[in-house]
Structure formats: C-alpha cells, structure tokens
C-alpha cells in the first residue's frame, strides 16, 4: 500500500499536466534550469576566487623562540 509504483507516478504526472498545463510547466522547467545553472556558476566562481586568494597569500616570516 505504501509503495510508489510507475502507475501512481504516471497518474500524478497526468494530474499535474492537467492542472498547470504544458506551457506553464515548460516555463517552470526553463526557470528551474536557469536557476540551477546560475547556482553552479556561482559555486565555480567561489571556488576559483578561493584558489586565487590562497595563491596570493604570502607566507609569514618564521619566528623562532630564543631561550
């Protein structure tokens, strides 16, 4: 009873298409795709900026303790 079968998924998909329509779903899919692209681009930009800042850091002079 709690299992999700392919038949149940198809019925749910058909109901979603009936409620929203194909044009609205296409628009929603395009918006979702562009949002994911933007997120991935931001993540890659963040990684490259971290790498650049790590390369630009100059190591500090070593301090030795004299007794």
Swiss-Prot record:
Lineage summary: Bacteria, Pseudomonadati, Pseudomonadota, Gammaproteobacteria, Enterobacterales
Keyword annotations from UniProtKB, A to Z: Cell inner membrane, Cell membrane, Membrane, Protein transport, Translocation, Transmembrane, Transmembrane helix, Transport
Gene Ontology biological-process entries: protein transport by the Tat complex
Name assigned to this protein: Probable Sec-independent protein translocase protein TatE
Protein's organism: Enterobacter lignolyticus (strain SCF1)
Function: Part of the twin-arginine translocation (Tat) system that transports large folded proteins containing a characteristic twin-arginine motif in their signal peptide across membranes. TatE shares overlapping functions with TatA.
GO MF term list: protein transmembrane transporter activity
Cellular component annotations (GO), alphabetically ordered: TAT protein transport complex
Membrane-crossing segments per the record: 4-21
Topology of the protein relative to the lipid bilayer: Single-pass membrane protein
Cellular compartments annotated: Cell inner membrane
Main location: membrane
Pfam families linked: TatA_B_E
Chain intervals for the UniProt region annotation (Disordered): 43-67
Protein family per UniProt: Belongs to the TatA/E family. TatE subfamily.
